A protein has these predicted regions:
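Conserved acetyl-CoA-binding loop-helix of GNAT-fold acetyltransferases
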Residues: 28-44
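General structural concept
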Residues: 21, 35-39, 53-55
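Conserved GNAT acetyl-CoA-binding A-motif
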Residues: 42-60, 67
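Conserved aromatic-histidine-acidic binding/catalytic patches
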Residues: 24-28, 32, 54-60
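Intrinsically disordered, low-complexity, charge-dense segments enriched in Lys/Arg
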Residues: 79-147
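Conserved acetyl-CoA binding element of GNAT-fold acetyltransferases
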Residues: 2-4, 12-26
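Conserved active-site alpha-helix within GNAT-family acetyltransferase domains
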Residues: 57-80
Length: 147
């Protein structure tokens, strides 16, 4: 199930805020979530939305903190809810400025999966050629290759 809001930001840009997105346990890992996101990206680009936004949650039944950046959502390190995790990131990845900087390598993804935390206001940039779109395309290609 999912809930979304269509909004306009302070600069007059249209965006979609994804409030919630939950899948049943039997649906996770099937590719359904990435397919739903791919469809939302295509629809939003066609309707001239500037970006998608969500709070990428971490909890007993929530893995958005990892899944959404893996598929292209990004945020500055200051958007990580936990100050102690922000400090650990700066120590482990001193060159990193955003969550996607951490997620750019397998080592970073592995570290984030264990140590990562809730991200406030993560954004998926819908502009052609954006890092979000490039990351999403690479993720989808990796899924196809894995089978």
């Amino acid at each position: 199930s999912a809930t979304r809001q269509f909004r306009i930001d302070d600069q007059g840009r249209k965006y979609i805020h994804n409030d919630t997105f939950f899948m049943h346990s039997g649906q996770t890992g099937t590719g359904l979530g990435s397919e739903i996101l791919a469809n939302q990206i295509a629809w939003a680009k066609d309707k001239d939305f500037a970006y998608l936004e969500c709070d990428a949650a971490r909890g007993p039944t929530m893995n958005g903190y990892y899944t959404w950046p893996r598929m292209g959502y990004d945020a500055p390190l200051s958007a990580i809810r936990s100050a102690s995790v922000q400090t650990k990131v700066k120590q482990k990845f001193p060159q990193a400025k955003t969550v996607l900087d951490i997620m750019a390598t397998a080592q970073g993804r592995d570290w984030w999966k264990v140590n990562g935390e809730w991200i406030n206001g993560a954004k998926f940039d819908l502009r052609e050629g954006s890092r979000s779109l490039q990351t999403h395309q690479a993720y989808m290609e990796e899924r196809r290759t894995r089978g």
